[in-house]
Regions:
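Small beta-barrel nucleic-acid-binding modules, primarily SNase/OB-fold domains
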Residues: 2-5, 13-159
Length: 159
């Protein structure tokens, strides 16, 4: 019994959970939502940060804002269901989320508003390949990958 208790404690400390959370979502940014008080990070994708800018045909646009507001528009007051089994270091559930029968994570990548976050998952690479080929969203111009942007990298200002 003692060994079982230790195992369960270690399992809980490791961030492993199994969650199915549903409800209307509050949007934090393009890849983070809150449902019923639980913060959810969309699995396997990374959207531009809220204040990140990109460039298309020489014109700067707010790609982070666009990702956030597009997600807000898709979700509005709809029921969102998220399925995940781990939490990240910030305590957010890492999950695949669904609304109206489609996978939000996949849709954001397919529309070119998010990148497949290969460091953590290969799941959405096919959607990214399609967005790149069709030059949708971010792929229509220049951008810095969100993970590089968070490290301080920016678009060349002398474009």
């Amino acid at each position: 019994m003692k060994h079982m208790y230790i195992f369960l404690c270690l399992l809980l400390l490791s961030g492993v959970v199994s969650a199915d959370v549903s409800g209307t979502a509050l949007i934090s940014d393009g890849d983070t939502i809150t449902i019923s008080g639980m913060k959810v990070r969309l699995n396997g994708i990374d959207t531009p940060e809220r204040d990140q800018t990109c460039r298309k045909a020489g014109v700067t646009w707010k790609c982070g804002y666009k990702a956030t507001e597009t997600l807000r528009g898709w979700l509005d007051t709809k029921e969102v269901r998220c399925l995940g089994d781990i939490k990240d270091r910030y305590g957010r559930l890492i999950a695949d989320c669904f609304v109206d029968g489609y996978n939000l994570n996949a849709k954001l990548v397919y529309e070119g508003l998010a990148l497949a976050y290969r460091k953590y998952s290969k799941k959405y690479i096919p959607e990214e390949d399609k967005a790149r080929a069709a030059k949708r969203g971010l792929w229509a111009g220049e951008f810095v990958a969100p993970w590089d942007w968070r490290k301080g990298k920016r678009l060349d200002p002398d474009y």
